[in-house]
Amino acid sequence: GDNRTIQAGFAFIVVGMGLKLAMIPLHVWLPNAYTYAPTVVTCFLAATATKVALYVLIRFVFSVFSYEDSFVNELFFLLLMPLAVVAMIAASVIAIFKQNLKKLLAYSSLAQIGYMLLGLSLMSQKGLSSSLVHMVNHGFTKAALFMSLGAFMLNTKNVYIKSLRGLGRSMPFTSGAFVIGLSLIHISEPTRRSY
């Protein structure tokens, strides 16, 4: 009786946080929110919204429940880990074909959320540490990317990849910041020691 109630409550909270976190398959709101919101709002959303939900989920799992509980382990290994891997692969593939930079960065964020959830689903100290480090890195870096994109939009009135042609000459510092941000988000993933 009580155990089933606790498990149902846990599942409801995980689903609620998964919706706020934009965990696949509860991610539908994120690409549209990033694409159609003003860039300043998108910058704030990208830096904080999903990170707060992930942090709440982490605190909930490690403070309210014991991660040694068998049903918590089963839920995370059997449900969260496959969803994280699907998010990492599917969102990355979808992002490749996006010409709208806001949508591209939104799907990139979904893939990065997959990395964070994979670390959490390992239910280990190293997995948790890597999720937290990546959460902070992603928050700062994605905010910087959207700030750079906002500067590009002021100059070109456009958010498509083709509109970036020639901006390296007319906006060298912003273009440099954008390239560094992309490097920090995507190139450093496999080389980070915590993964």
Regions found by a protein language model. Give the residues of each.
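A short, hydrophobic C-terminal helix/tail in secreted or cell-surface proteins
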Residues: 187-195
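Hydrophobic transmembrane alpha-helices and their helix-loop junctions in integral membrane proteins
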Residues: 1-188
